[in-house]
Amino acid sequence: MINIIFLHGLLGTKNDWQKVIENLPHFNCIALDLPFHGQAKDLEVTNFEDSAEYLAQQIKSAVKNGPYFLVGYSLGGRIALYYALQAQLERSNLQGVILEGANLGLKTDEEKQARFQQDFAWAQRFMQESPEKVLNDWYQQPVFSHLTTEERLQLVEKRKSNCGKNIGKMLLATSLSKQPDFSEKVRLSSLPFFYFCGERDHKFQVLAKENQIDLVTIPCAGHNSHLENSKYFSKKIENCILKIVRP
């Protein structure tokens, strides 16, 4: 049975993948909690290398030397990128990577400096303010603009129990400003990469097209397409994986 490892985004937990996994009965699906999240809430990391080492340990424990695919959403996708293309560690039998709404990296020092200031400000808020207050503002960001008021409130309610100093620390450890620009490495990699993106997620649609990645558009969905259209998302995962294992 083919193994699929799922990585959630900032503020999420492994349970975010439940609906997707239910639609993939013919695969061995393993969703992991990232550091500072869920059952790994007390596990501290300070950078991408630490995060990739944690990921390598979890994968080794889950699949031994068996073949596996990585699926990562947003922050989880960025950690998957670092693990697959940069980390100084053994990746054993990684067969391919599916990214969902994950930024490949910033190109200029100016962009990185601006992003660090932005992430630092958010991190301070996560560390100092009430979860409800900071999450209400977090979900007002342009990437979530397609959400209705009710959907925003549901997300705030869902995320507030996992929200606090831990999220601020993770934001600083894995700020996009600290991530290498992987756009060229993804294009040149012999490892298959696929990019999943909701049709309403215009920012990441543009990013995927600019970087000439193999784009899979998820209809009726925005940034969090695996949550908003789980069934279609699962079907496309299956299609991508079968392309590789049964060419």
Curated annotation (Swiss-Prot):
Task: Show the Gene3D superfamilies listed in the entry.
Answer: alpha/beta hydrolase
Q: Give the record's pathway.
A: Quinol/quinone metabolism; 1,4-dihydroxy-2-naphthoate biosynthesis; 1,4-dihydroxy-2-naphthoate from chorismate: step 3/7; Quinol/quinone metabolism; menaquinone biosynthesis
Catalyses which reaction?
A: 5-enolpyruvoyl-6-hydroxy-2-succinyl-cyclohex-3-ene-1-carboxylate = (1R,6R)-6-hydroxy-2-succinyl-cyclohexa-2,4-diene-1-carboxylate + pyruvate
Q: Which Pfam families match?
A: Abhydrolase_1
Q: Per the record's keyword annotation, is Lyase included, yes or no?
A: yes
Biological process per Gene Ontology, one example term: menaquinone biosynthetic process
Q: Which residue range or ranges hold the AB hydrolase-1 domain?
A: 4-229
What Enzyme Commission number(s) apply to this enzyme?
A: 4.2.99.20
What keywords appear on the UniProt entry?
Lyase, Menaquinone biosynthesis
Q: Which residues form the signal peptide?
A: none
Q: Name one GO molecular function term.
A: 2-succinyl-6-hydroxy-2,4-cyclohexadiene-1-carboxylate synthase activity
Top EC class, one word? lyase
Q: Which family does it belong to?
A: Belongs to the AB hydrolase superfamily. MenH family.
What assembly does the database describe for this protein? Monomer.
- Function, in words: Catalyzes a proton abstraction reaction that results in 2,5-elimination of pyruvate from 2-succinyl-5-enolpyruvyl-6-hydroxy-3-cyclohexene-1-carboxylate (SEPHCHC) and the formation of 2-succinyl-6-hydroxy-2,4-cyclohexadiene-1-carboxylate (SHCHC).
- What's the protein called, per UniProt? Putative 2-succinyl-6-hydroxy-2,4-cyclohexadiene-1-carboxylate synthase
- Which organism's genome codes for this protein? Haemophilus influenzae (strain ATCC 51907 / DSM 11121 / KW20 / Rd)
